[in-house]
Amino acid sequence: MAVQKSKKSRAARGMRRSHDALTTAAVSVDSASGETHLRHHVTADGFYRGRKVINK
């Protein structure tokens, strides 16, 4: 197992963890169906930018 040579300070620990924050997903509402979806993704009904692109 790897063992550190010396204890890391609280500042070094905090700097390492500064990039670990989670962000919320960008959600949009479709203009045609009013359904929420991820940005730049097709809705579950098959709409993208107000047009039907996938027929189920």
From Swiss-Prot:
Domain of life: Bacteria
One Gene Ontology cellular component: large ribosomal subunit
Single GO BP term: translation
RNA-binding found in the keyword field: no
Region annotated Disordered, chain positions: 1-22
Key word Cell membrane present: no
Compositional bias annotation for Basic residues: 1-16
Keywords associated with the record: Ribonucleoprotein, Ribosomal protein
Stretch forming the signal peptide: none
GO MF annotation terms: structural constituent of ribosome
Record-linked InterPro entries: Ribosomal_bL32 (IPR002677), Ribosomal_bL32_bact (IPR044957), Ribosomal_zn-bd (IPR011332)
Family: Belongs to the bacterial ribosomal protein bL32 family.
Record-given protein name: Large ribosomal subunit protein bL32
Chain's gene name: rpmF
